[in-house]
């Protein structure tokens, strides 16, 4: 037995010497010597070693390390400590241990949780998966120091368990007495502890076989590896595979629990902060200066280029990705800078595709669905820890997306209780939990991009937007912009969409030949921690524009160049850093337009609001103006930014409503009807208006006058509503009062109410006010006819010669 132990020690010393030779490569390229010096300067104690370098220099030792990991890693770490001591002796004494992390090509040992079988026990493996669960970080004792007051001596004891690399676990009991039964005092300040965390990673859904549930494996993280990952991250974990015996009734059972003791964790998810070179920044600066007039149009057009149309929605999503400026006042009040957008519309209008594009573009984005997530799943949940049985908090999607975007699809399918759970997050940017003895406040400063279908499945144009949307005002007011996306029957528009979609389906990437069958399975798996193709791509210079492809981009137009996604991502990242300040001109414009928005539909008869205009709408205008200024990389918010924000808001806030066709008796002969049908379109509309005016029917506030007898084709307003009102003609004009005169009367009456600063005005005062400075004054008959019409439309009420504004 002694001979075997001596042989093991000799082998260990031999392995340690070979590893030391590998690290001391000053005569060769000096890679690892410089790495160790960098590690010392950064105050780290884990060295990342590429297994390919060890394989190239000492193939036998690399093979032994891969297949007999525990002894190999212990020898490697001892060699590292000796090498650090030879470079900097004082630094080597600061830490109890130095650690080795591995990377490189693992070949057959590059596995998923499903293919991690018993033949890999005691080997180094690389496992890919998605982190599903993270435990709390707890301290674990490594060495305890005890002092005996009677003998004035100190005793040290080291502790190891089955999650350590050492072969034999030690006793976990603290000594309380020495050999002579003298009591001992534990010196906690001199004892050494290490951080300890358990995570669970699950097989990636794209790697799992069809029709089978993904499998998972437990990972042990120690020291500097703790808190490197969070739930939802895609990771590669390199470590040693070990089994832990489980006891039943005092006896070790034949079934074992397996764990992976990690020595390195590599993130596979996209980087939150892209890497910038000086050339990249120069290109971004040059682009913003050379396209100073149309930079907003250019960027929004390059957003989701595979989706045709929806230009206003793309502009809103661009503003959402940039966000406004968050303000925290001295008294603790927080004014949010995140922009929330809600898309409501018919099926198949590319709502989910827009959400998916944001997931690929935004630096941090978390996807959820309405039925697949609960209120606590979105905010935070109180769960029971499996190891200790304690209650603890688990972060939900919105907490994980802090400073990012949450994309919620099928928003209308969520229950009301779950929807109310996100009220606080959307306005305050935090989650407050007070349950099960836990009171906590978590940051959730994220933008919300939600997509929903209308109440009736499809949008009913004969009902108001509020009836179609079916969400509470308290929730709608928290969305900065609400877009109604309609699937309209327009032959020209349908032709453009079909041409665009067919081109997408005909497109093939550069490596494919025409006529070749596309592979059904996934691409070839790279059995290494680094993809060699990715490194070559990173060395290429940043392309500002996508290379033009006739199938992807259609007929080449000089002005319609599409920016590359990588350039978009970097441009957005740089633009977000700016914090523009409102100028006086922009501030006064926003204040004036906000008051106009509040009074917009008092006199308008053909549009309805999609969401309530509250004080939050004023903040919306400020946030959108700031985002537009960020696109220009400006330090101030100018008037043009405020005008662009107003255009977006007016497009999103107002929606036209149709009135269903009413069956009326024919009051004219058959010959008149035939005459009408043969009339040109414009004359026919005039005649219908005239006939309706003679009938003197009551006028509905949400009524279209010129589309009563036709199939409704409703377009969402693309110009500010003020312009639309001027184009509309009122069909309810009585004989002797034209539509223009009625409109002029309404405008004059509204001005009179504003001047009086009151909700009621006497008839005599009203007559004087509307005819003051008027080139064509209103007669008594005209005023009477106009008041009757407005009273029928529920705009005003006349009583005792006093006009009341309703």
Swiss-Prot record:
Quaternary form? Component of the mcm2-7 complex (RLF-M). The complex forms a toroidal hexameric ring with the proposed subunit order mcm2-mcm6-mcm4-mcm7-mcm3-mcm5. Begins to associate with zmcm6 into mcm complexes at the neurula stage. Component of the CMG helicase complex, composed of the mcm2-7 complex, the GINS complex and cdc45.
Organism phylogeny: Eukaryota, Metazoa, Chordata, Craniata, Vertebrata
Instruction: List where Basic and acidic residues composition bias occurs.
Output: 693-702
Note the InterPro entries from the entry: AAA+_ATPase, MCM, Mcm3, MCM_CS, MCM_dom, MCM_lid, MCM_N, MCM_OB
Which reactions appear under catalytic activity for this entry?
Answer: ATP + H2O = ADP + phosphate + H(+)
In this chain, ATP is annotated as bound at 345-352
Specify where the region named Disordered lies, as residue ranges: 662-738
Chain ranges for the short sequence motif Arginine finger as given in the UniProt record: 477-480
Give its localization.
Answer: Nucleus; Chromosome
Q: What is this protein called?
A: Zygotic DNA replication licensing factor mcm3
One Gene Ontology term of the molecular function aspect: ATP binding
In this chain the MCM domain maps to: 295-502
Sorted keywords for this record are: ATP-binding, Cell cycle, Chromosome, DNA replication, DNA-binding, Helicase, Hydrolase, Nucleotide-binding, Nucleus
Q: What is its main location?
A: nucleus
Q: What does this chain do?
A: Acts as a component of the mcm2-7 complex (mcm complex) which is the putative replicative helicase essential for 'once per cell cycle' DNA replication initiation and elongation in eukaryotic cells. The active ATPase sites in the mcm2-7 ring are formed through the interaction surfaces of two neighboring subunits such that a critical structure of a conserved arginine finger motif is provided in trans relative to the ATP-binding site of the Walker A box of the adjacent subunit. The six ATPase active sites, however, are likely to contribute differentially to the complex helicase activity.
The UniProt similarity line reads: Belongs to the MCM family.
* Pfam families (UniProt xref): MCM, MCM_lid, MCM_N, MCM_OB, WH_MCM3_C
Q: Would you kindly state one Gene Ontology biological process term found in this protein's UniProt entry?
A: double-strand break repair via break-induced replication
Its top-level enzyme class, in one word, is: hydrolase
Question: Known EC number(s)?
Answer: 3.6.4.12
Q: Which organism is it from?
A: Xenopus laevis (African clawed frog)
């Amino acid at each position: 037995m002694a001979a075997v132990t001596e042989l093991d020690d000799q082998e260990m010393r031999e392995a340690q010497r070979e590893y030391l030779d590998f690290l001391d490569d000053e005569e060769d390229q000096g890679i690892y010597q410089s790495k160790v010096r960098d590690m010392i300067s950064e105050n780290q104690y884990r060295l990342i070693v590429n297994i390919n370098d060890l394989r190239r220099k000492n193939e036998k030792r690399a093979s032994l390390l891969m297949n007999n990991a525990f002894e190999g890693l212990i020898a490697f770490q001892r060699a590292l400590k000796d090498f650090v001591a030879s470079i900097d002796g004082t630094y080597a004494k600061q830490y109890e241990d130095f650690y080795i992390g591995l990377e490189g090509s693992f070949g057959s040992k590059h596995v998923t949780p499903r293919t991690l079988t018993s033949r890999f026990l005691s080997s180094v493996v690389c496992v890919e998966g998605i982190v599903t669960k993270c435990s709390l970080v707890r301290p674990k004792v490594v060495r305890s120091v005890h002092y005996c007051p009677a003998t004035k001596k100190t005793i040290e004891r080291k502790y190891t368990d089955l999650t350590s690399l050492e072969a034999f676990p030690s006793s976990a009991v603290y000594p309380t007495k020495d050999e002579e039964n003298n009591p001992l005092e534990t010196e906690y300040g001199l004892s050494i502890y290490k951080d300890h965390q358990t995570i669970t990673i699950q097989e990636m859904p794209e790697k799992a076989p069809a029709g089978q549930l993904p499998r998972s494996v437990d990972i042990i993280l120690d020291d500097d590896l703790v808190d490197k990952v969070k739930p939802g991250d895609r990771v590669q974990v390199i470590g040693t595979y070990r089994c832990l015996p489980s006891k039943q009734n005092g006896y070790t059972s034949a079934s074992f629990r397996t764990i992976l003791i990690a020595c390195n964790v590599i993130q596979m998810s996209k980087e939150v902060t892209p890497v910038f070179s000086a050339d990249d920044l120069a290109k971004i600066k040059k682009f913003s200066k050379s396209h100073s007039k149309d930079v907003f149009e250019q960027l929004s057009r390059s957003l989701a280029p595979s989706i045709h149309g929806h230009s206003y929605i793309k502009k809103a999503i661009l503003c959402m990705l940039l966000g406004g400026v968050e303000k925290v006042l001295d008294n603790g009040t927080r004014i949010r800078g995140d922009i929330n957008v809600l898309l409501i519309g018919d099926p198949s209008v590319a709502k989910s595709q827009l959400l998916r594009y944001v997931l690929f573009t935004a630096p941090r984005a978390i996807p959820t669905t309405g039925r697949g997530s609960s209120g606590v799943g979105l905010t935070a949940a109180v769960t029971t820890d499996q190891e200790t049985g304690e209650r603890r908090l688990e972060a939900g999607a919105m907490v994980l997306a802090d400073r990012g975007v949450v994309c919620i699809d099928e928003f209308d399918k969520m229950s009301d209780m779950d929807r109310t759970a996100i009220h606080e997050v959307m306005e305050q940017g935090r989650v407050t939990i007070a349950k099960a003895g836990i009171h906590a406040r978590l940051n959730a400063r994220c933008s919300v991009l939600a997509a929903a279908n209308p109440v009736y499945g499809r949008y009913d144009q004969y009902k108001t937007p509020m009836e179609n949307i079916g969400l509470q005002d308290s929730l709608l007011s928290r969305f900065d912009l609400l877009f109604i996306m309609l699937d309209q029957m327009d032959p020209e528009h349908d032709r453009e969409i079909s041409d665009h979609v067919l081109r997408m389906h005909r497109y093939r990437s550069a490596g494919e030949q025409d006529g070749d069958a596309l592979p059904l399975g996934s691409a070839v798996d790279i059995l290494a921690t680094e993809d060699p193709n990715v490194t070559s791509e990173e060395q290429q210079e940043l392309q500002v524009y996508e290379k033009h492809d006739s199938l992807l981009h259609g007929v080449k137009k000089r002005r319609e160049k599409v920016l590359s996604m990588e350039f978009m991502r970097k441009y957005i990242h740089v633009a977000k850093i700016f914090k523009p300040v409102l100028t006086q001109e922009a501030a006064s414009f926003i204040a004036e337009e906000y008051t106009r928005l509040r009074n917009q539909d008092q006199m308008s008869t053909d549009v309805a609001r999609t969401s309530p205009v509250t004080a939050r709408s004023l903040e919306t205008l400020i946030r959108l103006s700031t985002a537009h200024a960020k696109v220009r990389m400006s330090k101030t918010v100018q008037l043009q930014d405020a005008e662009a924000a107003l255009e977006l808001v007016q497009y999103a806030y107002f929606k036209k409503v149709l009135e269903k066709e009413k069956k009326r008796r024919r009051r004219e002969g058959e010959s008149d009807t035939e005459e009408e049908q043969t009339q040109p379109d414009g004359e026919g509309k005039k005649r219908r208006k005239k006939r309706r005016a003679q009938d003197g029917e009551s006028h509905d506030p949400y009524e279209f006058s010129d589309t009563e007898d036709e199939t409704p084709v409703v377009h969402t307003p693309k110009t500010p509503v003020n312009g639309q009102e001027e184009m509309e003609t009122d069909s309810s004009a009585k004989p002797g009062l034209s539509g223009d005169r009625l409109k002029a009367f309404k405008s004059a009456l509204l001005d009179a109410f504003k001047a009086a600063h009151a909700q009621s005005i006497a008839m005599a005062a009203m007559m004087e006010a509307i005819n003051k400075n008027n080139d064509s004054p209103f007669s008594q008959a005209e005023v009477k006819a106009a008041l009757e019409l407005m009273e029928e439309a529920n705009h005003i009420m006349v009583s005792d010669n006093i006009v009341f504004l309703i």
